[in-house]
Regions:
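Active-site-adjacent beta-strand/loop module that shapes the phosphate/pyrophosphate-binding cleft
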Residues: 39, 87, 96-120, 127
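Short loop segments at secondary-structure junctions
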Residues: 39-42, 50, 114-119, 132-135
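Short secondary-structure junctions
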Residues: 83-90
Length: 164
């Protein structure tokens, strides 16, 4: 699994968030490994962003930035151990999306994770919730919304992906 190529041979979509806000012209693209943890009942894990981070309190799939020389799978394994205390047994590269936030330009490399060991421990004082469509936690991070749309398509779900 490469750390810079899309997970699937599809074009990478760029989504712009808060387009009216200024952006620095010299922002580097930040590679992020994102774990989409799915239980046997098809519920998926969302965690809240910790205080002190951009979009604190928003709900997202757990993950984090790649370090120099890491693959997506290596970064995901490290980040999920550091942030939520689990060890992933395997992951499947799934989708890739670029999000242009005012504070950062990120490439989100989503991986499905169905097998892990350990109990969830929110090591950054974040909250967690196992969700189904439509998700009931709010607010949802803009970078998370495409995943909910992909789930809806895969699961033939019709309706809002985030409850009103």
């Amino acid at each position: 699994m490469s750390s810079t190529e899309p997970a699937i041979n599809e074009p990478i979509t760029v989504r712009v968030v808060d387009a009216q806000l200024p952006r620095s012209a010299d922002r580097a693209l930040v590679q992020v490994a994102v774990g989409v943890l799915i239980r046997s009942d098809d519920s998926f894990l969302l965690t809240s962003r910790p205080e002190g981070k951009a979009y604190a309190g928003y709900w997202e799939f757990p993950g984090g930035k790649l370090e120099v020389g890491e693959t997506i799978a290596q970064a995901l394994k490290r980040e999920l151990q550091e942030e939520i205390g689990i060890t992933i047994e395997d992951c499947m590269s799934w989708k890739t999306e670029q999000i242009d936030y005012p504070h950062a330009l990120v490439q989100l490399n989503f991986c499905k994770v169905r097998r892990w060991s350990g109990e969830l421990q929110m090591r950054e004082a974040q909250l967690y919730a196992w969700q189904q469509l439509p998700v009931t936690v709010k607010p949802v991070l803009p970078g998370t919304l495409p995943v909910l749309e992909w789930f809806a398509k895969e699961r033939s779900f019709v309706g809002l992906t985030v409850a009103e």
